[in-house]
Amino acid sequence: MTRYARIIGTGSYLPPKRVTNHELAAQLAEQGIETSDEWIVTRSGIRARHYAEPDVTCSDLAAKAAERAIEAAGIDRAEIDLILVATSTPDFVFPSAACLVQQKLGLSNHCAAFDLQAVCSGFVYGLATADKFIRAGGYRNALVIGAEVFSRILDFNDRTTCVLFGDGAGAVVLQASDEPGILSTALHADGSHADILCVPGNVAGGAIKGSAFLYMDGQAVFKLAVNVLDKVAREALALAEVESSQIDWLIPHQANIRIMQGTAKKLGLPGERMVVTVDEHGNTSAASIPLALDAAVRDGRIQKGHHVLLEGVGGGFTWGAALLRF
C-alpha cells in the first residue's frame, strides 16, 4: 500500500508587539529617515508587522506555534517522531532551533530534530523534506515549523528593507496516511543569484566579519521571483496532474503584494482565491506560508478536500511549491 503524508493540524504564533507603518515611520523619523504609510503600502501592501521582544528567541516562537499545531492535530506530543525547523534566524549557531523546540515541548522520546535553511522558501523545503521522510516509511508524525526573528537582522537605517520584515512562527503536523495529502512538491535553487538577497557576514574569531544586516536588491528579486514562482507552481500542478483551475486556495510567500498578485494572474486565479496576510504580518520569511495557512484553516476558508497550492521564493536563490489536498 502506498504511504502518503497529510497535514492533520496547523498552528501559528505572532509576538504581541504590533508595529504599524505610522509607528515605524515615526521611529525612523527620529533617526532622520523619511518614510510613510503610503510609501510602504504602495510598494509592498504591508500595513503592520510584529516584533519579538529582546528576550524572546526564534525557538520560543516556534515552540508556541508547535503547541497549537499539536493541539489542533489531536495527538499526544510524545507521538512526534521528527521535528524540522525552517529558519534563517536561529537562537544560536548551534544547537539547532529544532533541538531547543524539542526541549521546550518536553519531548523525551529522542525523536530526530534538525534545522533547514532556505530563507523564505524554507517552509516549502521543510514540508517537502518531511513528506519524503514519511513516505520512506521511517516516520509517522512530523512537526514542520517555519519561524523567524528577522527584526534582529534588519538595518533600521535602510528604509528599503527595514519596513518589510516581521517576526512570527507557523507550524503543521504531518502524519502518515493511506490517503494522499501532499500531492506533489518541487524544489529548485540557483546559487548564481546568491548576492541579491543575503546577510553577507559571518562570525570569525569572536567578531562579525562583513555585515550582519540583511541586504536586498529589490528590483532583481522582484524580476526573478515572479518568473520562477509561475514555473514552479506549474511544475507542482503537472506532477499531480491537477489543472490551475482546480486550485481552491493559493498561499504564496507573503513578501510583497505585487509579486503575489503577479503570480496569481499568471496562474489565471482571481485574487479572492489567494490567502493574503502580508498586510498584517509583513514578510516573515520561512514563517509566512504556515502563518497564512493556519489563518485560512482556522477561519474556515480552507475545507477538507480543497486543493491548496503553497509556493515560496527566497535568498540563495531558492524557490519551491507544494500542492496539497486538505
Curated annotation (Swiss-Prot):
Domain remarks: The last Arg residue of the ACP-binding site is essential for the weak association between ACP/AcpP and FabH.
Annotated GO MF terms: 3-oxoacyl-[acyl-carrier-protein] synthase activity; beta-ketoacyl-acyl-carrier-protein synthase III activity
Sorted UniProt keywords: Acyltransferase, Cytoplasm, Fatty acid biosynthesis, Fatty acid metabolism, Lipid biosynthesis, Lipid metabolism, Multifunctional enzyme, Transferase
One of the GO BP terms on file: butyryl-CoA biosynthetic process from acetyl-CoA
Stated role: Catalyzes the condensation reaction of fatty acid synthesis by the addition to an acyl acceptor of two carbons from malonyl-ACP. Catalyzes the first condensation reaction which initiates fatty acid synthesis and may therefore play a role in governing the total rate of fatty acid production. Possesses both acetoacetyl-ACP synthase and acetyl transacylase activities. Its substrate specificity determines the biosynthesis of branched-chain and/or straight-chain of fatty acids.
Subunit structure: Homodimer.
Native organism: Ralstonia nicotianae (strain ATCC BAA-1114 / GMI1000)
Ranges for region ACP-binding: 254-258
HAMAP family: FabH (MF_01815)
Catalytic function, reaction form: malonyl-[ACP] + acetyl-CoA + H(+) = 3-oxobutanoyl-[ACP] + CO2 + CoA
E.C. number(s) listed in UniProt: 2.3.1.180
Gene3D superfamilies per record: 3.40.47.10
The name this protein goes by in its record: Beta-ketoacyl-[acyl-carrier-protein] synthase III
